[in-house]
Amino acid sequence: MAEGTRVAQDFGADIIDINMGCPARQVTGGLSGSALMRDLDHAMTLIEATVKAAAVPVTLKMRLGWDHGTLNAPELARRAEAAGVRMITVHGRTRCQFYGGRADWSAIARVREAITVPLIANGDGVSAADARAMLAASGADGIMLGRGAYGRPWWPGVIANLLDPGSGIMEPTLAEE
């Protein structure tokens, strides 16, 4: 991780984002992505090495935990912040949920209670109403768009307008789409 951090910085990276949220089997099978939610000590070794090697801010993306029996995102977030991570994004599902069911935005709020750095909520932000509800339920400082933006390149502008009226764009009508 330290070497990758140095290489990324040499190529001009403005931040280093550690992705511990990927649920794909080909990623988690090698103790990467959200599989790191099963071994927080190992995850912290990687986070600490990255922060130590970084001259730019380090951010972290994770899920709520591996499964509903290990909802350890608040603990990992607290430890990551103490190690120097500057922003944390939480996807409101466990790894075992993949993308099924609904994201649990209120569970993201438990991470908000554990940290002081900016918190970004992720998962099921597919409408302006969802974005408002996600922010309200999670207490997050912002949202990260994912699958909800597929095929809708204007979606970030709509969310910007929602958060700061007049700064973004309005959602296009069906005719405009």
What are these language model-derived features?
Residues 1-81:
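Active-site entrance/lid segments in N-terminal catalytic domains of soluble metabolic enzymes
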Residues 21-23, 61-67, 93-95, 122-126, ...:
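Active-site beta-loop-alpha junctions enriched in small/polar residues
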Residues 25-42, 93-104, 163-168:
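Glycine-rich tight-turn/loop motif centered on a GG-T
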Residues 45, 53-55, 69-87, 99, ...:
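Alpha/beta catalytic cores of nucleotide-metabolism and tRNA/nucleoside-modifying enzymes
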Residues 4-6, 103, 134:
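Surface-exposed beta-strand edges and their flanking turn/coil or helix-capping segments
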Residues 12, 28-29, 91, 95, ...:
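Short, functionally important structural connectors and interaction interfaces within domains
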